[in-house]
Swiss-Prot record:
It is found in: Host nucleus. Residues 192-196 are annotated as: Ori-binding. It comes from Porcine parvovirus (strain Kresse) (PPV). This is Initiator protein NS1. The gene is NS1. Residues 2-275 are annotated as: DNA-binding. The endonuclease active site can probably bind other divalent cations. Multifunctional protein which displays endonuclease and helicase activities required for initiating and directing viral DNA replication. Also plays a role in viral packaging and transactivation of several promoters. Binds site-specifically to 2-3 approximate tandem copies within the origins of replication (Ori), unwinds this hairpin region and nicks one DNA strand thereby initiating the rolling circle replication (RCR). Cooperatively binds Ori with host PIF and probably other host factors, which activate the nickase function of NS1. A divalent metal cation binds at E120, H128, H130.
Length: 662
């Protein structure tokens, strides 16, 4: 250390290194030996100094000897004899071998771990070695496993280095004594309620600075203190005793609070106070991760975060803990997100500029029925966003192979947190539908005695349902998506048909009747289809609210909703969705004029308006400009509806309907 307040580079580096690692968690192990008597043969701590031919062991001992010599204060001569020094160097190499082999057995990289080793001699404990071990992938639940592995490795290496001649039986006995006697111990604490031992994690940098660096070095046989220390960053290996104390002092001063806050705690507040355990913190972190990763089932948890799943499964009552953790996760998603939110967040913004909604399989299915597919998709998103009011159910019905289940299954898979109606469970059909973002009813039939409960759920009411083996549980308003080949509005209880339920059921349904059979090679919907549809609708101004729906389409959808109105007509030579618009009828007197829109690019949402606001451009309020002579006018391509009108005019109204080429 230089004069004044200028500190050596080694001291500053060590202090900064401890600051960077102050709050990192680490296991605290103690390696030790015991005095053993086997058939009259005394084995003490200084009898494990057998010569070795292992090159790695020799290199480790040389490195430890270099640290010992450079850390020795030359102002006095150490009274530690050479045999004791050699024994400590051998123990240092054995401890490092045990650490590296244990890390490799766990498939961890030594470069991802940090450690600190200090050899000491205590008044009551004799020789022992403190080891702090932490790193990426080392969690609290692994502490006892590591202790067992280190204990086995430590006993094996001690037998190999024992200089006392032993028979094979005595070697086995010595190893049993080392393993059963736990010659490698782990810092633990006793739980107040369970009275069990749990691993106690320490703060790596704080433990070194406040505890290990303040100890005095052993220089004589009568004194007690430390022999040698080393770490993974080579920061304390060569520090002399005075420099170690200085590093500890600088670290303490840097972490000393500037002001001391004084608080007064009453006896009642102290009684209510509770220390948050490590287990509680771990569960809270796990729940937060599961919510962020949208894990709603045990299978999803196993695939996305197997480490936390195994950690909980290994604890006492692990199955119940996993079940309760998932229940909190699904409840959080159900209360904070809608099914529409979970779909929309999966949209990739990079794909939206090139996205063509008319090329999606969903819109192709709707186009086969000559429907305005933008209107249908807008209505579906409103229901998924809990904006449909009493009409809280999306009903896909019609013959087989018309695309009902394809769309419903795709939406359900995107939502993830889905509950299924179980018709086979007569007493508890909605047992799986609590704390969900969507309820999926596949191939619905006659609801019979459950019709009243069914109507309440389909209308988005908050009701309580019975669960098997449990008490009743509340179902919050949850959108329902349903597919069926039957007429679910006809309710039969026994042999009696109950027509009074027909109209209430219709009032709760967004009726989408699919009748066109799909070809065999139609395929499934792409994973990105509906997220991009939702994002495209938002971009074009079709918000998933009923106010937006009524603004664009005039009224809320009912059972007999005409999805084909307003019609969507695509010119023959412009098949892109950006040019879809409603046709404008003109009179013969207007043929000499061309309608010029007020804005260059008329928004698609505006083009599909079935009516006009005072500020909405229509044919009557567009700026009309004279057109050039007929020879200079490029005749626009006719639309399919105009072609159909001409054919009907030529062949009469009784001609066969034209084929829908859209």
């Amino acid at each position: 250390m230089a004069a004044g307040n200028t500190y050596s580079e080694e001291v500053l580096k060590a202090t900064n290194w401890l600051q960077d690692n102050a709050q990192k968690e680490a296991f605290s192990y103690v390696f030790k030996t015991q005095k053993v008597n086997l058939n009259g043969k005394e084995i003490a701590w200084n009898n494990y100094n057998k010569d070795t031919t292992d090159a790695e062991m020799i290199n480790l001992q040389r490195g430890a000897e270099t640290s010992w010599d450079q850390a020795t204060d030359m102002e006095w001569e150490s009274e530690i004899d050479s045999l004791t020094k050699r024994q400590v160097l051998i123990f240092d190499s054995l401890v490092k071998k045990c650490l590296f082999e244990g890390i490799l057995q766990k498939n961890l990289s030594p470069s991802d771990c940090y450690w600190f080793i200090q050899h000491e001699h205590g008044q009551d404990t004799g020789y022992h070695c403190h080891v702090l071990l932490g790193g990426k992938g080392l969690q609290q639940a692994m502490g006892k496993w590591f202790r067992k592995q280190l204990n086995n490795l430590w006993s094996r290496w001690l037998i190999m280095q024992c200089k006392v001649p032993l028979t094979p039986v005595e070697r086995i006995k010595l190893r049993e004594l080392a393993e059963d006697g736990e010659w490698v111990s782990l810092l633990t604490y006793t739980h107040k309620q369970t009275k069990k031992q749990y691993t106690k994690m320490t703060h790596f940098g704080n433990m070194i600075a406040y505890y290990f660096l303040n100890k005095k070095r052993k220089t004589t046989e009568r004194e007690h203190g430390y022999y040698l220390s080393s770490d993974s960053g080579f920061m304390t290996n060569f520090l002399k005793e005075g420099e170690r104390h200085l590093v500890s002092h600088l670290f303490t001063e840097a972490n000393k609070p500037e002001t001391v806050e004084t608080t007064v705690t009453t006896a009642q507040e102290a009684k209510r106070g509770r220390i948050q355990t490590k287990k509680e913190v771990s569960i809270k972190c796990t729940i937060r991760d599961l919510v962020n990763k949208r894990c709603t089932s045990i299978e999803d948890w196993m695939m996305t975060d197997p480490d936390s799943y195994i950690e909980m499964m290994a604890q006492t009552g692990g199955e119940n803990l996993i079940k309760n953790t998932l229940e909190i996760t699904t409840l959080t998603l159900a209360r904070t997100k809608t099914a529409y939110d979970l779909i929309l967040e999966k949209a990739k913004p990079s794909m939206l500029p090139t996205f063509n909604i008319s090329n999606t399989r969903t819109c192709k299915i709707f186009s086969m029925h000559n429907w305005n597919y933008i209107k249908v998709c807008h209505a579906i998103t409103c229901v998924l966003n809990r904006q449909g009011g009493k009409r809280n159910t999306i009903l896909f019905h019609g013959p087989a192979s018309t695309g009902k289940s394809i769309i419903a299954q795709h939406i359900a898979n995107l939502v993830g947190n889905v509950g299924c109606y179980n018709a086979a469970n007569v007493n508890f059909p909605f047992n799986d539908c609590t704390n969900k973002n969507l309820i999926w009813i596949e191939e619905a039939g006659n609801f019979s005695n459950q019709v009243n409960q069914f109507k309440a759920i389909c209308s988005g009411q908050t009701i309580r349902i019975d669960q098997k083996g449990k008490g009743s549980k509340q179902i919050e308003p949850t959108p329902v998506i349903m597919t069926t080949n039957e007429d679910i509005t006809k309710v039969r209880i026994g042999c009696e048909e109950r027509p009074e339920h027909t109209q209430p059921i219709r009032d709760r349904m967004l009726n989408i009747n699919l009748t066109r059979k799909l070809p065999g090679d139609f395929g499934l919907l792409e994973e990105t289809e509906w997220p991009l549809i939702c994002a495209w609708l938002v971009k074009k101004g079709y918000q998933a609210t009923m106010a937006s729906y009524m603004h664009h389409w005039g009224n809320v959808p009912d059972w007999s909703e005409k999805w084909e109105e307003p019609k969507m007509q695509t010119p023959i030579n412009t098949p892109t969705d950006s040019q879809i618009s409603t046709s404008v009828k003109t009179s013969p007197a207007d043929n000499n004029y061309a309608a010029t829109p007020i804005q260059e690019d008329l928004d698609l949402a505006l083009a599909l308006e079935p009516w006009s606001e005072p500020t909405t451009p229509t044919f009557t309020n567009l700026h009309l400009t004279p057109t050039p002579p007929d020879s200079a006018i490029r005749t626009p391509s006719p639309t399919w509806s105009e072609i159909e009108t001409d054919i009907r005019a030529c062949f009469g109204e009784n001609c066969a309907p034209t084929t829908n080429l859209e």
